[in-house]
């Protein structure tokens, strides 16, 4: 199922939280929704899931308009909110059975099946309030998945988890997302790199990027080149810096250097020329490209 957002604006009183947002997520895509705190990510997700209305604009899921009264289309959406609201006095199995009872028109997974899928088997007899943060997140993900939704909206699904738990939840999202349309917000860029096809970036309520993961880096043009090079012997550092017109040169290992240059022309050819002139062999050389953190900072500063 696709998600189509058309010219969505949202006001809270006089404050504009979203400003004329439009995008489309196609069936089967896993899309990251990034932005600083307070940028409007959670607001947009609440509008997509029908929890709150937009002030203007429209949202369509599978061609059907999302509004407060369209309960049928909401049956196709699984949602894990940022604060993961749970009934802490209920037992895990009891809670998931309770959630499943609301989706009578959906081919729900069995409680046992969803417990196995989300790694809750050992904790299923416990009250939710006694679980660790990681297992509470798993319960939240289980309730979002139990009705086998076609669309999955995950707001900070890995917040507060340790590295092992993050990898486990990431793998779970990848596995369950194979036949679903997934939109997730996160501050963990490695997560985006690992599982997402496309990236949306929002800042101050405005959509500032909508790119495939492989193309997002073109949004940032570095003002300097950074090259890491390894020689077979130690060169004269001053001579190397002069030959490549380096703005900065840092020794990073026994025979390795990190060279920064403001030159417009590719400095790698100058490094090779220097090596030949000084009877050196270049063992390795790599030009650093902009990373996702740089793109994020550049577009949201």
Predicted feature descriptions by range:
Residues 2-5, 10-203, 207-209:
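ABC transporter nucleotide-binding domains
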Residues 58, 226, 281-284:
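Residues at or immediately flanking beta-strands
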Residues 66, 104, 232-233, 264, ...:
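Short beta->alpha junction loops/turns
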Residues 78, 104, 119, 200, ...:
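A generic structural signal for secondary-structure junctions
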Residues 110, 236-240, 267-271:
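Hydrophobic side chains in well-ordered alpha-helices
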Residues 171-258, 262:
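ABC transporter nucleotide-binding domain
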Residues 263-301:
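C-terminal coupling/interaction segments
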């Amino acid at each position: 199922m696709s998600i189509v957002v058309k010219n969505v604006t949202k006001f809270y009183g006089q404050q504009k939280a979203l400003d004329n947002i439009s995008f489309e997520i196609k069936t089967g895509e896993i899309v990251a929704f990034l932005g600083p705190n307070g940028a409007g990510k959670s607001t947009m997700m609440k509008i997509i899931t029908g929890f709150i209305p937009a002030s203007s604009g429209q949202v369509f899921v599978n061609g059907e308009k999302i509004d407060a009264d369209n309960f049928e289309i909401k049956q196709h959406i699984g949602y894990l909110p940022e604060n993961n609201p749970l009934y802490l006095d209920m037992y895990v199995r009891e809670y998931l059975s309770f959630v499943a009872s609301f989706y009578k028109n959906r081919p729900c997974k069995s409680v046992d099946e969803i417990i196995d899928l989300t790694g809750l088997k050992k904790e299923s007899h416990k009250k939710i309030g006694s679980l660790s943060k990681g297992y509470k997140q798993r319960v939240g993900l289980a309730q979002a998945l139990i009705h086998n939704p076609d669309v999955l909206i995950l707001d900070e699904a890995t917040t507060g988890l340790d590295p092992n738990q993050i990898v486990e939840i990431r793998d779970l999202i990848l596995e369950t997302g194979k036949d679903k349309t997934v939109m997730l917000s996160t501050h963990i860029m490695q997560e985006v790199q690992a599982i997402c096809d496309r990236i949306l970036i929002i800042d101050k309520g405005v959509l500032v990027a909508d790119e495939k993961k492989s193309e997002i880096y073109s949004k940032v043009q570095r003002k300097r080149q950074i090259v890491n090079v390894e020689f077979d012997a130690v060169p004269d550092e001053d001579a190397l810096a002069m030959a490549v017109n380096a703005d900065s040169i840092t020794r990073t290992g026994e025979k390795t250097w990190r060279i920064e240059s403001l030159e417009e022309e590719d400095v790698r050819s100058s490094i090779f020329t220097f090596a030949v002139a000084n009877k050196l062999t270049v063992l390795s050389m790599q030009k650093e490209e902009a990373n996702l953190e740089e793109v994020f900072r550049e577009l949201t500063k």
